[in-house]
């Protein structure tokens, strides 16, 4: 084991000598208190270490001890419902062990409890041939998730021993006879966070991730296994949007990373999620959630670790054939941590002081998203979908973190402070946002809703763009100077904005909107548009069209349950629309 000595300390960056024999990204214990750090640079016998804990009080001359292993996470039953810090230390366990609401420096608590016994049910039998990724048994970890125990990387052969029963994560549940001899398999495995977990190959992203948010699903959909960015200035609703995604997304597991954001926002997640029901299983949302809390007052170096810890945990659940959503709030804080450490290392700064390797670091993270065919002899498919919030100072989307993120992700949900000030939520600007997955996922929508979904969606987008062009004229001469047809376009665009795009995150029905309800709502508004244009062409007054009472029914449809709306209200609204608009024709 390499033992060196501290010669320089600069904030979270420590320089140690006598480190010959160390490896890049090796975890080391720094100082007399044994603070956790990671080697990020090696020169001759000197190592530069980023320390994941507060360095106040340590001094030159104290020891640095290598562990011989890279920064790794423990993967196994017990991760769901847990809350970790950036280097996978369980916060609840630390509080119980130290009787303190603060994390003491140098504290070491196992990431996964070694005392809890899990009921392991073997699905493989003695004599079965197994390879890496094969499922040999299951554990009912929470009411929502059955945790699959897999053969770790590098083991393949014939099962010599396996039995069902209650085991801790360190006890042997199976013995595999391999070419190199007998290998024991436990329920827990370790994986280095910077190394992507392997798969057989990536699959095309053709299935949409249903989030229940109309503007995201219908207009700017993200595919399962895709990557999306939510940039927006302060107060535009990034965190509420992330919370909505974590609550309602059509996934099996959610990994929520609070990376350098306010502690109150993590508190909100912890307080809310245990009381909310998962629409897929009917169980509590917390049963399928892993929280990684790395708030703004925690050491900056741990922000990078929290992002890699989160994506590695997400890939592990993906390898079980599950769908995982990873939300990172916010990647800008991670980039700021990189900038701070780069400054301490006296590296050549890039644009706005960020390091020159900013774009490659972001790409390494987002490229770990994807829908894959999992390792193993059975046909398993899983996906990781990444949604990263970006907090550009002053809402400037041309700044380096936002512009580099846009080069990597295929979905851009641009939050607009002006919409937020007008109380339009989600404040996603339909003119600047985009999705490059629409062509890929249109087939699923047409199969699961109706064949005209794509044409309705494109026509609605065209109307919203046309409204933006007409607004300039309206501000100069007023709406009454416009031709009748264009006055109808303005009215329909207003209905699209207020009755379709706006959504109440705190309303028990409107908080989540199913794909079929989304389609029917859009169909009604676009049917109204077609019939209103027809009525105007036959001599109806646009003022009369704007005054029909069916518009009140259209405005209220978002608050109706799926059953009531689709089975009862849709035909009623269309019949009422036809009779009221028909009565206006002279």
From Swiss-Prot:
GO cellular component, one term: proton-transporting two-sector ATPase complex, catalytic domain
Ligand binding (ATP): 232-239
InterPro entries: ATP-synt_VA_C, ATP-synth_a_Xtn, ATP_synth_asu-like_sf, ATP_synth_asu_arc, ATPase_a/bsu_AS, ATPase_F1/V1/A1_a/bsu_N, ATPase_F1/V1/A1_a/bsu_N_sf, ATPase_F1/V1/A1_a/bsu_nucl-bd
Membrane topology: Peripheral membrane protein
GO molecular function, one term: proton-transporting ATPase activity, rotational mechanism
Catalytic activity entry: ATP + H2O + 4 H(+)(in) = ADP + phosphate + 5 H(+)(out)
Main location: membrane
Biological process, per Gene Ontology: proton motive force-driven plasma membrane ATP synthesis
Keywords for this protein: ATP synthesis, ATP-binding, Cell membrane, Hydrogen ion transport, Ion transport, Membrane, Nucleotide-binding, Translocase, Transport
EC id: 7.1.2.2
UniProt cross-references to Pfam families, sorted A to Z: ATP-synt_ab, ATP-synt_ab_N, ATP-synt_ab_Xtn, ATP-synt_VA_C
Cell compartment(s), UniProt: Cell membrane
Record-stated family: Belongs to the ATPase alpha/beta chains family.
Subunit structure: Has multiple subunits with at least A(3), B(3), C, D, E, F, H, I and proteolipid K(x).
NCBIfam families, alphabetized: ATP_syn_A_arch, PRK04192.1
Function statement: Component of the A-type ATP synthase that produces ATP from ADP in the presence of a proton gradient across the membrane. The A chain is the catalytic subunit.
Designated name of the protein: A-type ATP synthase subunit A
Organism: Methanococcus maripaludis (strain C5 / ATCC BAA-1333)
Lineage: Archaea, Methanobacteriati, Methanobacteriota, Methanomada group, Methanococci
Gene that this sequence comes from: atpA
């Amino acid at each position: 084991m390499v033992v060196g000595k501290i010669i320089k300390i600069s904030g979270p960056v420590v320089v140690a000598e006598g480190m010959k024999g160390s490896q890049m990204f090796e975890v080391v214990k720094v100082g007399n208190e044994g603070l956790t750090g990671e080697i990020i640079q090696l020169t001759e016998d000197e190592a530069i270490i980023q320390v994941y804990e507060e360095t106040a009080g340590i001094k030159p001359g104290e020891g640095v001890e290598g562990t011989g292993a890279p920064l790794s996470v423990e993967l196994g039953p017990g991760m769901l419902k847990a809350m970790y810090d950036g280097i996978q230390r369980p916060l609840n366990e630390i509080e119980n062990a130290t009787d303190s609401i603060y994390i003491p420096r140098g504290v070491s608590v196992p990431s996964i409890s070694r005392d809890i016994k899990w009921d392991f049910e073997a699905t493989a039998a003695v004599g079965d041939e197994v390879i890496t990724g094969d499922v040999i048994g299951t554990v009912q970890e929470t009411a929502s998730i059955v945790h699959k125990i897999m053969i770790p990387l590098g083991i393949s052969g014939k099962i010599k021993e396996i039995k069902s029963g209650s085991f801790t994560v360190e006890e042997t549940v199976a013995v595999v006879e391999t070419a190199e001899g007998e290998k024991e398999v436990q329920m827990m495995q370790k994986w280095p966070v910077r190394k992507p977990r392997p798969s057989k190959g990536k699959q095309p992203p053709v299935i949409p991730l249903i989030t229940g948010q109309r503007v995201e699903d219908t207009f700017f959909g993200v595919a399962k296994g895709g990557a999306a960015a939510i940039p927006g200035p302060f107060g535009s609703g990034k965190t509420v949007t992330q919370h909505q995604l974590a609550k309602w997304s059509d996934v099996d597991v959610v990994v929520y990373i609070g990376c350098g954001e306010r502690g109150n926002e993590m508190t909100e997640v912890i307080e809310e999620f245990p009381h909310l029901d998962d629409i897929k299983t009917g169980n509590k949302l917390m049963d399928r959630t892993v929280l990684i809390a790395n708030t703004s007052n925690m050491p900056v170096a741990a922000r990078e670790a929290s992002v890699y810890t989160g994506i590695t945990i997400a890939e592990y659940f993906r390898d079980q054939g599950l769908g995982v959503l990873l939300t990172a709030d916010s990647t800008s804080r991670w980039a700021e941590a990189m900038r701070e450490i780069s400054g301490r290392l006296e590296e050549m700064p890039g644009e706005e002081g960020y390091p020159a390797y900013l774009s490659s670091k972001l790409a390494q993270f987002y490229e770990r998203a994807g829908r894959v065919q999992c390792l193993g002899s059975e046909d398993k498919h899983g996906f990781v979908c990444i949604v990263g919030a970006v907090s550009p100072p002053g809402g400037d989307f041309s700044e380096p973190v936002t512009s580099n993120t846009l080069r990597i992700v295929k979905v851009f949900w641009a939050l607009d402070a002006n919409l937020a000030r007008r109380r339009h939520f989600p404040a996603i600007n339909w003119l600047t946002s985009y999705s490059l997955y629409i062509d890929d996922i249109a087939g699923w929508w047409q199969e699961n809703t109706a064949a005209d979904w794509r044409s309705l969606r494109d026509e609605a987008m065209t109307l919203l763009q046309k409204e933006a062009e007409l607004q300039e004229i309206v501000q100069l001469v007023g709406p009454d100077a416009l031709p009748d047809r264009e006055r109808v376009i303005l009215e329909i665009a207003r209905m699209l904005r207020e009755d379709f795009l706006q959504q109440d995150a705190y309303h028990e029905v409107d908080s989540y909107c199913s794909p079929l309800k989304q389609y029917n709502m859009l169909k009604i508004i676009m049917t109204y548009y077609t019939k209103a244009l027809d009525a105007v062409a036959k001599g109806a007054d646009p003022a009369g069209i704007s005054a029909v009472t069916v518009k009140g029914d259209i405005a209220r449809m978002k608050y109706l349950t799926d059953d009531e709306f689709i089975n009862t209200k849709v035909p009623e609204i269309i019949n009422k629309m036809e009779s009221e608009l028909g009565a206006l024709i002279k």
